[in-house]
């Protein structure tokens, strides 16, 4: 009886997962990306350079969590084994053309990420310890007046990012170390739990500081390997680019045909960069923005989508396509295909490098995923006791994931994430006018040559702003003087 029940549950989860990621989410997220791109006047292209400038400026030390730390934390969650294994699967299923559609969806997703992160900053709150918190649950409650909607989103995110994804990330780490070095999975799991506990028990600030250290190292190391493969095969690059375009548009036979390439590439891009999911918006709200305007964090997260997909996913694609592993059947897919490609190009030592990369990618994802979930736990309840219990449960799931096979958990997490995205897209479409006006205010100040500063008194139509956070310093001083007199 129990086995039949589990089979039915697994069948239902797989069906829902296929429906969400196979059709519904693709159309919804693409439509949202097109809408926001048009309404913002292709801002991801017009002001791309300005976004890069803000990421660099965000490294300045401030009292709180800097924009650069938030950028690194969101990248820690975005960049994982999916940027390696997922790209390999996309190419296997859809052919080289999948890469073209992956690029396209990322460019559209940059606008969606801009909108949701700007809204997260607008409706953020300050907790009892002076830490900024926000995200979709908060703008659903404060912007739409729908706490029930925020509650649903929070529960879905906690299931996906707090528990399931962290279990799978731990499982990937232990597999990598066990396969490369023969290490015992239980011992590895205990080490991962202790390292995770040290960081997540320090709260969002410690997570942000750890991400600031780990993410640049893992990104530079992986990009350096990809660049090495690119340089040693530079003569093949024009042909590879031509194949990507021809396969995408159906001018040349692809593994899955033009439609297969489109679906595989779009799905991979959406899943990788998380634009529209509402996940990165949770940490975006935690930034002490520089300059002091909500739209600045929109620019930062827009660049995050670009780096995740256009830079890192493309690096994986380059390694696979230039190595020659696609020229003949080899029975490999996913991370195995990437490993074979690296072995062909760089030799057996690349197995150790890939294990190292997986460790950094997965561990950084664990702590970043936790930070997303923590903000949503605090949305549901302000109880420190509940937060303490939640941290214990997260660490327990990390340990379980280290030693167990979790395919059903992974599929359930995908369903939670898909439903989470649908709820978030509905909210940001309903709040899009607020985002447009805030972003327009930023652009007007930028064009006039001043550092954009957000003055909440200029936006009487925006309700439920946290008192004092978004009134500029001059305005606050004027108010205080008036009250004194």
Which residues does each predicted region cover?
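Alpha-helical membrane segments and immediately flanking helix-loop junctions
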Residues: 61-93, 119-137, 141, 258-306
């Amino acid at each position: 009886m129990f086995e039949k029940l589990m089979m039915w549950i697994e069948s239902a989860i797989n069906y829902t997962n296929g429906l969400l990621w196979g059709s519904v989410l693709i159309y919804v997220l693409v439509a949202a990306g097109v809408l926001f791109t048009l309404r913002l006047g292709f801002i991801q292209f017009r002001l791309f350079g300005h976004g890069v400038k803000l990421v660099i400026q965000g490294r300045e030390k401030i009292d709180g969590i800097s924009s650069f730390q938030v950028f690194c934390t969101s990248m820690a969650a975005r960049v994982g084994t999916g940027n390696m294994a997922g790209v390999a699967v996309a190419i296997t299923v859809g052919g080289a053309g999948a890469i073209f559609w992956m690029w396209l969806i990322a460019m559209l997703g940059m606008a969606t990420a801009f909108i949701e992160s700007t809204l997260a900053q607008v409706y953020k709150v300050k907790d009892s310890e002076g830490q900024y918190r926000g995200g979709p649950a908060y703008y659903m409650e404060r912007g739409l007046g729908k706490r029930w909607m925020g509650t649903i989103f929070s529960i879905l995110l906690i299931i996906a990012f707090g528990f399931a994804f962290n279990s799978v990330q731990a499982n990937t780490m232990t597999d990598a170390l066990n396969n490369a070095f023969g290490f015992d999975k239980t011992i590895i799991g205990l080490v991962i739990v202790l390292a995770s506990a040290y960081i997540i028990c320090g709260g969002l600030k410690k997570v942000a500081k750890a991400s600031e250290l780990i993410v640049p190292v893992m990104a530079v190391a992986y990009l350096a390997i990809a660049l090495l493969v690119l340089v040693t095969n530079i003569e093949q690059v024009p042909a590879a680019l031509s194949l990507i375009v021809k396969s995408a548009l159906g001018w040349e036979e692809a593994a899955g045909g033009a439609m297969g390439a489109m679906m595989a590439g779009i799905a991979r891009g959406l899943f990788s960069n998380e634009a529209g999911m509402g996940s990165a918006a949770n940490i975006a709200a935690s930034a002490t923005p520089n300059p002091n305007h909500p739209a600045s964090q929109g620019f930062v997260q827009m660049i995050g989508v670009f780096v995740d997909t256009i830079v890192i996913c493309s690096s994986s694609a380059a390694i696979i396509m230039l190595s020659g592993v696609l020229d003949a059947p080899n029975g490999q897919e996913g991370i195995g295909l990437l490993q074979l490609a690296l072995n062909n190009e760089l030799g057996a030592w690349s197995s150790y490098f890939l294990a190292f990369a997986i460790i950094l990618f997965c561990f950084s994802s664990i702590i970043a995923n936790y930070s997303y979930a923590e903000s949503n736990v605090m949305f549901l309840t302000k109880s420190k006791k509940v937060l303490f219990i939640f941290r214990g449960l997260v660490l327990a799931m990390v340990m379980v994931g280290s030693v167990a096979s979790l395919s059903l958990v992974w599929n359930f997490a995908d369903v939670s994430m898909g439903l989470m995205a649908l709820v978030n897209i509905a909210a940001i479409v309903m709040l899009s006018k607020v985002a447009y006006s805030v972003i327009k205010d930023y652009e007007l100040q930028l064009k006039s040559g001043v550092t954009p500063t957000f003055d909440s008194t200029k936006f009487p139509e925006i309700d439920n702003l946290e008192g004092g956070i978004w009134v500029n310093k001059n305005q606050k001083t004027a108010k205080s003087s008036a009250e004194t007199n």
